[in-house]
């Protein structure tokens, strides 16, 4: 991120962030917007399996079981968690919050021989578990220059050979993992300019004309395999002119990508979002006419670095420790910073959920166990216990933004309500039987939706 962009932001954070106090956002109009764009009216007719409508005055309960909106978490990090005895509880806590999961497909992690892909068992287990839970799955990524094997990073291989390998890899992922609903295309494509000029993958990107054209090449290839797939451009710096140019190039050439991913890793003051900054980013990118994903969210529960140079020195210290086999330095999560994390997450999610262009919010590292950059940003601590931020998000996602109703039917088994978009179950007692049915509330609902009720538990 350019220093000229960072400096004005830093000044605005020094007092509040340095003291581990979050200045609560005004959130003016946020609740009204949520009421309008995330909820809708629903008209139902409750019908028994034999075709008879339930009598007028029948008491029923409605419970939302799933959000239409993507509340997501990453399973592409937290590498050590599956080795812990509390891994089952980790999964329970994850499933309690999220209906959407990011799954890792880092090339260099799963391939150590040219031409051979060996997907790790722990990644496969996470993918299968999330799929069984009915979560929407995001593959991360089809391509990323930070995690390519040595034969793709090579400064000596001809571009035509690189092109053959890269495109074969991209096609293989989409073809072999049809259960993945969405894919990050080439993750953080504009960042390739920060790599050595002779790096293989950089030479490959530049041979196609840069981030925009290479996005078109990848999209065209994967659309042949998965015409109805969803494919996302994603970057770490929303104010990077080359990211905006990539999007504009894709739109100009009518490249059929589906959404824009914006990351928000807040490891130093310049990367911490204010209310004004977040709303401005969402407004600016919504003008492109694509759904927005806040694709990687990190809010720290430890002391934050004042600027990128200080964070960079810290990262070098971590790298040096790993090279020499010394313990990796890690900042402590503290109660004050955990409160800061919870309050900022509450406000960040509320404002984002209130913007009509946003369809996904995805938290990055779920636990503080061996955290990325040695800086805890988890919803759970290093022992898998819920932190204040977990409870803050649970209150929003599972209580404030979820519909639970008890009411009575009118004539002909009819009823109506207003609720959050998503999936529902309806339950009522009749003649000693528990009857239950399911339905979805969508932004384009049927005029009247028949819900067939069937015996759930027999008599009792």
Regions found by a protein language model. Give the residues of each.
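Bacterial N-terminal signal peptides that target proteins for export
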Residues: 1-7
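Bacterial N-terminal signal peptides
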Residues: 7-16
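Beta-strand-rich domain onsets/edges
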Residues: 21-78, 112-113, 138, 152, ...
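Alpha-helical scaffolding within the catalytic cores
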Residues: 58, 79-92, 121-126, 168-173, ...
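Short Pro-Gly-centered beta-turn/loop motif in secreted/extracellular proteins
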Residues: 83-97, 415-423
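Aromatic- and acid-rich polysaccharide-binding/catalytic face
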Residues: 95-108, 113, 180-187, 191, ...
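Substrate-binding cleft and catalytic face of glycoside hydrolase catalytic domains
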Residues: 96, 100-116, 123-231, 236
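Aromatic-rich peripheral "rim/lid" segments of glycoside hydrolase catalytic domains that contact
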Residues: 184, 189-221, 277-291, 300-459
